[in-house]
Amino acid sequence: MKYVPYLVCYFFGISTTFLFSSERCVNIHLDIRTRPDLSASYISENANFQIHYDIEGINAPSLNDENGNDIPDYIESVAEIAEDSRYKLVNVMGYLEEPNDVDGLYDIYILNQSAWGWNIVEDTNTGSSYVKIDNDYSGNNFNSEYCLNNLDKMKISVAHEYFHAVQRAYRPNPATDHDFFLEMSSMWFEDLMVPDCNDYLSFVDALSYSIFNNPTQKFDGSDLTSGQSSANFGYSMALFAHYLTNSLESTNDSFGTTIIRQIWINYSSGVSARDAIIQTIENEFNDSFSRVWTDF
């Protein structure tokens, strides 16, 4: 297995003073980038996910267990949203299954951390990865104007990070300058799963180089300057993903849309994210990108 120091990170909702003043994601050195060693685990009902957690110490989630089955309710909630996200993406929307590691279970680790979520790539040949999320989503790092419920914050984080796992079924080792597309897609999907948490709007509102605060910005972020993050820009571009699904497709069913999946299919051929978006609009949806972008 080939290990590389590359990951996708996800911190949205932090105060804008911190959030937009620096890069939110850094490469993790190989010697410290190892899977957490936690004391307990739970396999989800449909046996697609293994949720790892501690029952004591700083990483332990709430151990509330209303149904008395010896599995903390928080852990069961993580498993439920993971399974629901997978069902929606794979069974309903037709995306490829996520690349898995040797045991066939996708691993999610519950930790006390400052990040909303991490999706960490293990193998750039197969695209296998794992996810780390927070154990309670409380504290200033998780303040959000648009998503107030801590359980909902967990749900959008799991949905977001799981879609990153699915994305690598199309391209196991995407170019880092395509981060805007990965994050645009995951922010869009999390909003489908928890539609009352429109947290991508915090980036539209507050990011100085979002497309609405800087209308001359290129749609793929290729003209970002030093200190400006392609991933941050991609969070704000979730609004463009919503625009594409709502304006270019006739379905009223959010999970019946196909345009984002088609972009991923085109992206899997090795073209740039920019070209995959343009090709999909012009070839599969018979429209002009210039018209679409101007209308947006």
Q: Model features per residue range: what roles?
A:
Residues 111, 176-225:
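Post-HExxH zinc-binding segment in Zn-dependent metallohydrolases
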Residues 7-17:
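Bacterial N-terminal signal peptides
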Residues 162-171, 233-254:
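Alpha-helical scaffold elements that line and support the substrate/ligand-binding pocket
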Residues 22-49, 55-129, 134-162, 166-170:
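Zn2+-dependent metallopeptidase catalytic core
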Residues 72-75, 219-231, 263-267, 278-281:
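Active-site rim elements
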Residues 1-5:
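Positively charged n-region of N-terminal signal peptides that target proteins for export
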Residues 268-296:
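Beta/coil-rich, acidic/histidine-enriched accessory regions frequently appended to metallopeptidases
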Residues 90-108, 172-179, 198-205, 251-272:
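Surface-exposed patches in mature extracellular/periplasmic domains of secreted proteins
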